[in-house]
Design a protein with these regions (language model features):
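Secretory targeting and sorting signals
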Residues: 1-35
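Extracellular/luminal low-complexity Ser/Thr/Pro-rich, glycosylation-prone repeat/linker regions
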Residues: 34-39, 136-163, 264-326, 443-470
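A surface/secretory-pathway sequence property marking extracellular, secreted
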Residues: 35-37, 68-108, 152, 157, ...
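Surface-exposed, proline-enriched loop/turn segments that connect beta strands in immunoglobulin-like
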Residues: 42-48, 88, 165-170, 214-215, ...
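Hydrophobic beta-strand positions in extracellular immunoglobulin-like domains
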Residues: 61-65, 122-124, 140, 184-187, ...
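Low-complexity, intrinsically disordered segments enriched in Ser/Thr together with acidic residues
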Residues: 105-130, 231-274, 409-439
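Acidic, serine/threonine- and glycine-rich low-complexity intrinsically disordered segments
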Residues: 229-361, 366
C-alpha cells in the first residue's frame, strides 16, 4: 500500500495545515519544544466498514512529531480478532498482533513540525455482520517524549458505501473555456448500490452543461445546484465512472478561483428534491451514464484518503480565472439646513467583470467599505450591516452599531457581490455646524496602509460633502 493524497493541492493543503494546527492545539502540542525534549502524537479516527464480502476501507493514521527521537507508532490489533483485519504499508513491521510504523518515508526529516499519515486498510472477516464492532489500540512513542495512547473503534455496517473519487483541479482557465470535472466512484460496502444520485454545487462563475437526467436550481450566493440520477448497479468492490465527466463553462463573471463540489449517494433511498429550491429539468442534452472504470477497485481503495461518510464528497478546483475586478466607492452629498436631520448615503458598486465572494475578498465579508463622517455632522441612526469603529493605542476596532461615531464599517449582506451590482446604506444624520472637513467613503480601512487592491485604485475612495440649505 502507498499513502494517498487528496487531488487538490494549494488551497486544499492550506486548509489541511490549518485544520492540523487546530488539532494540535486541542491535543496540547507545545508552542515550542523544551530543550532536549520531544513531542509525538498520533490520531486514528473511528471507521465503519461493510459486513463480510465488502472489499475494505483505507483509513489514515495521522502522525505529528516535533523534535522527536526515533518516533514510531505501535498498533495493537488484538481487539480486531473475529471482526476485521488491518493491512499496513511495507515499511511497517508486524510481530503477531502488533504492528510498528516509523514516520512515513515522505515526511520531511528537516521540518520543525513533521506531519504525515500511515494508510491502514481494514477488511471485514468472514462472519462479520452489521452491528459488530471492535477496538484498535495504538501508542505514539519516541525515545525523548512521553507516550501518547489512544483507541479507535471499527464498526461493521450492512449496506452500500459509495466513495467519491472525482476530485481534481486545473491551474488556470479563461472566460468561455469548456472544462469537465471527473465523475468516478467506488463501492466499499457489502451490498450493491442500485443507481447513484450525484449532487453538484457550482460556484457563481461556473455554468453547468445541460444533461437530460439532471435537475437544476439556483442557490444563494449566485451558485447553482444540479442533481443527477444515474441508473446502473455499483457492486461491492466495483469502480464506476462517467465518460467525459461533468461539463461546465467558465462564465463571464468568473474571477480568481472557482470550484465545483459533488456528493454521491445510492439512488435507492435518496430523499426527494426540496420543492422550495424549484428544481427544473432543462430541454435537450444527453444522459450521464455510469460505466466500469479502467482503474481497478483495489487501487481506488488505496487512494481513498478518508472512508467515513465524508468520502461521498469531492471537489474540482479552477485555481485562477484572469478577469477584471473593480469596486467603486459611492457617496451622495449630505443636504439639509443647519440643525436639521437628513441622510448620509454611502455604498459600493461592482463595475468590473468578475463576481466577488466573501472568501476572495480576503476580509471574511464581501465588499466591506468604510465611512468617515464629515465634520459638523452627527450620526443619529445606523443602518443594518454597519458598525462603529474606534481607535485605540493598538489600532482600530469595531464596536456596536452605535450613533455618534466618526467612523463606520459596512458590508454587503450577501456572500457574493456580483458584477454590476450596487449596495447602498442610509445613515440618519443631523447637520450641527458648517465649514467642517469633508467625510469619505473608502474601500480601505482607516490607517496608513491600503487594505484593498483592485484594477482601479482611483475610484476606491470618494468624498462625502455637506451642502447647506437655507
Amino acid at each position: 500500500m502507498r499513502s494517498a493524497r487528496r487531488p487538490h493541492a494549494r488551497a486544499g493543503r492550506a486548509a489541511v495545515v490549518l485544520a492540523v494546527t487546530a488539532s494540535l492545539v486541542a491535543l496540547g502540542a507545545p508552542a515550542q519544544a523544551e530543550t532536549g525534549s520531544g513531542w509525538f502524537q498520533a490520531q486514528l479516527d473511528d471507521v465503519v466498514i461493510g459486513a463480510a464480502g465488502a472489499p475494505g476501507k483505507a483509513k489514515p493514521l495521522y502522525v505529528y512529531a516535533q523534535d522527536a527521537v526515533n518516533p514510531r507508532v505501535v498498533v495493537d490489533l488484538t481487539g480486531l480478532l473475529g471482526v476485521a483485519s488491518a493491512e499496513f504499508p511495507a515499511w511497517c513491521a508486524t510481530s503477531g498482533t502488533q504492528v510498528t510504523c516509523p514516520l512515513p518515508p515522505d515526511v520531511d526529516p528537516d521540518s520543525s513540525l513533521q506531519i504525515g499519515s500511515i494508510p491502514v486498510l481494514f477488511r471485514p472477516l468472514a462472519g462479520a455482520s452489521g452491528g459488530d464492532s471492535a477496538t484498535v489500540s495504538y501508542r505514539a512513542v519516541a525515545d525523548n517524549a512521553d507516550p501518547f495512547v489512544a483507541t479507535a473503534t471499527v464498526s461493521v455496517g450492512d449496506g452500500a458505501d459509495l466513495v467519491n473519487l472525482g476530485g481534481g483541479r486545473v491551474d488556470t482557465a479563461a472566460v468561455g473555456d469548456l472544462l469537465s470535472a471527473p465523475i468516478r466512484l467506488t463501492n466499499v460496502g457489502n451490498r450493491t448500490s442500485r443507481g447513484v444520485r450525484i449532487t453538484f454545487t457550482l460556484s457563481s462563475g461556473l455554468t453547468p452543461s445541460t444533461w437530460s437526467n439532471c435537475w437544476y436550481a439556483p442557490l444563494t450566493g449566485h451558485r447553482t445546484s444540479v442533481v443527477c440520477d444515474l441508473n446502473g448497479r455499483v457492486r461491492p468492490g466495483a469502480t464506476m465512472e462517467v465518460s467525459g465527466g461533468f461539463g461546465f463553462e467558465i462564465g463571464g463573471s468568473a474571477y480568481a478561483g472557482e470550484s465545483l463540489d459533488q456528493f454521491v449517494e445510492p439512488l435507492t433511498g435518496a430523499a426527494a428534491l426540496p420543492t422550495q429550491l424549484g428544481y427544473q429539468r432543462r430541454e435537450g442534452g444527453t444522459k450521464l451514464r455510469l460505466r466500469p472504470s479502467r482503474t481497478t477497485s483495489a487501487a481506488a481503495r488505496v487512494l481513498t484518503p478518508e472512508i467515513d461518510p465524508g468520502d461521498n464528497w469531492a471537489s474540482f478546483y479552477v485555481d485562477n480565472v484572469p478577469n477584471s475586478l473593480d469596486l467603486a466607492a459611492l457617496a451622495e452629498p449630505v443636504v439639509g439646513p443647519v440643525g436639521g436631520s437628513t441622510i448620509l448615503r454611502a455604498g459600493v458598486r461592482n463595475i468590473g467583470a468578475g463576481d466577488l465572494d466573501d472568501f476572495r475578498s480576503g476580509a471574511g465579508e464581501v465588499a466591506p467599505f468604510y465611512v468617515r463622517v464629515p465634520s459638523g455632522v452627527t450620526v443619529e441612526s445606523v443602518p443594518d450591516r454597519c458598525v462603529a469603529l474606534y481607535e485605540s493605542e493598538d489600532g482600530w476596532y469595531s464596536g456596536e452599531p452605535q450613533p455618534g461615531a466618526s467612523w463606520y464599517r459596512c458590508a454587503v449582506p450577501s456572500s457574493v457581490f456580483a458584477a454590476g451590482e450596487t449596495y447602498q446604506v442610509d445613515f440618519g444624520v443631523r447637520i450641527t455646524s458648517v465649514g467642517g472637513a469633508a467625510g469619505a467613503v473608502s474601500l480601505n480601512m482607516p490607517g496608513p496602509y491600503p487594505s484593498w487592491w483592485d484594477d482601479d485604485r482611483d475610484n476606491d475612495e470618494v468624498a462625502v460633502v455637506v451642502q447647506i440649505q437655507s
